[in-house]
Every structure is written in C-alpha cells, then in structure tokens.
C-alpha cells in the first residue's frame, strides 16, 4: 500500500472514518527535515501495509486541518485510531522510534 495524499476535504473520510490505525505525516515541500523523514514514512507504509494506513498532508495547501490539530512545527507525525488522535511524534525521528510508537497501537 502506497502513501496517499489527503486534503482538508478528504481528511475525515481517509483518517477519521478509517477502520485501521492511521499514521498522518504533516509536511511541506520546503521543509528539509520533512524530506529526511519521507523515506522512513514510505518504508513504514510498505512494512505495515496490512496493519495501518499511512497518509501525508501538505500543511501549506491544507491549513485548516493543520490548525485544527495545532501543528506548530513539521514534520509532525500523528497516529489516529478509531477516529481519535492517540499519539504524536514531532521531528525527523529514526525509523525505530516511529516503529516503537506505532507498535503500541497495532493489535
């Protein structure tokens, strides 16, 4: 399963109403650390494809959702389960950090 892009308009359908846990990568094209973490997010999407959904949302193009969730710095990675935000990881973190955070929410 590849990483899909979501927008302010599709966020509820793709993230909130999803049966699987969802990892949301809040990013922007000009953000260097976002580009550093992008391959990690892509690898997570491949390795966990049967357990989670992974999406990215460009905060420049979709400011409503970014503001709603209080995004102050990017990259910010949020985990949603059953429509609720359950965890947040801020910054370009190692894959192991992201995996250990995700594993808490995968049954």
From Swiss-Prot:
Active site: 31 (nucleophile), 34 (nucleophile)
Gene3D superfamilies referenced in this protein's UniProt entry, alphabetically: Glutaredoxin
Residues annotated as site: Deprotonates C-terminal active site Cys: 25
Disulfide-linked positions: 31-34
Alphabetic keyword roster: Chloroplast, Disulfide bond, Electron transport, Plastid, Redox-active center, Transport
UniProt function note: Participates in various redox reactions through the reversible oxidation of its active center dithiol to a disulfide and catalyzes dithiol-disulfide exchange reactions.
Name of the molecule in the record: Thioredoxin
Source organism of the structure: Porphyra purpurea
